[in-house]
């Protein structure tokens, strides 16, 4: 279980008042929004595209479905889902950060992706959608930034249709010691320097590295999803567990 429901929580390695975390996270993403896509490619050596492609394939979206791309940021998953669900379907790109939403909206419109996509500024902990509304929900690299993860998972369960699927793509825990050592050096020595060079903001990427370490590991997140009421929960490790895709169903 998450302990984020108390009056304090973590912001990276810092302990902060729970009600202040959302604003602090917002500051990070306001700062990096304009260069977010570039940094994703650089810091993952482009591998994030493979992780996201696997997520989309695992979702099993079909024409006519309603998909929620939560914490969807600059719209990578939304763009793919929009083509899959077609004119009879709908994709909702939701993010708590208006700077990220603005970048995502402009990017998708420049690609001609309009008509079956709508944009909503929303807090994952209290989603502003009806019960039993979406066929699929994805949250990619967003859950670790949420203050009360249990509340967010419960909110996602509520708005999923019976038979619907949640997919959580998130940084996790490498499975082998040698990979953990390499990953630590890269995350804390190299990544902030990249952030400084590309976005002029080393601190935000230091937070991102710390937030990954504070996020629940694979089995803990699986248990959190089961505790919320998801069934048939499982996960797939990618790149030795640097990233994991968790899947669960609402029945």
Swiss-Prot record:
Gene Ontology BP, a term: menaquinone biosynthetic process
Enzyme kind, highest EC tier: transferase
One example GO MF annotation: 2-methoxy-6-polyprenyl-1,4-benzoquinol methyltransferase activity
Signal sequence, start to end: none
Keyword Cell membrane: no
Pathway it works in: Quinol/quinone metabolism; menaquinone biosynthesis; menaquinol from 1,4-dihydroxy-2-naphthoate: step 2/2; Cofactor biosynthesis; ubiquinone biosynthesis
SUPFAM superfamilies linked: S-adenosyl-L-methionine-dependent methyltransferases (SSF53335)
One Pfam family linked to the record: Ubie_methyltran
Ribonucleoprotein in keyword set: no
Record-stated family: Belongs to the class I-like SAM-binding methyltransferase superfamily. MenG/UbiE family.
NCBIfam families reported in the protein's UniProt record: MenG_MenH_UbiE (TIGR01934), PRK00216.1-1 (NF001240), PRK00216.1-3 (NF001242), PRK00216.1-5 (NF001244)
Described purpose of this protein according to its UniProt entry: Methyltransferase required for the conversion of demethylmenaquinol (DMKH2) to menaquinol (MKH2) and the conversion of 2-polyprenyl-6-methoxy-1,4-benzoquinol (DDMQH2) to 2-polyprenyl-3-methyl-6-methoxy-1,4-benzoquinol (DMQH2).
Protein name (Swiss-Prot/TrEMBL): Ubiquinone/menaquinone biosynthesis C-methyltransferase UbiE
Naturally occurring in which organism (per UniProt): Shewanella pealeana (strain ATCC 700345 / ANG-SQ1)
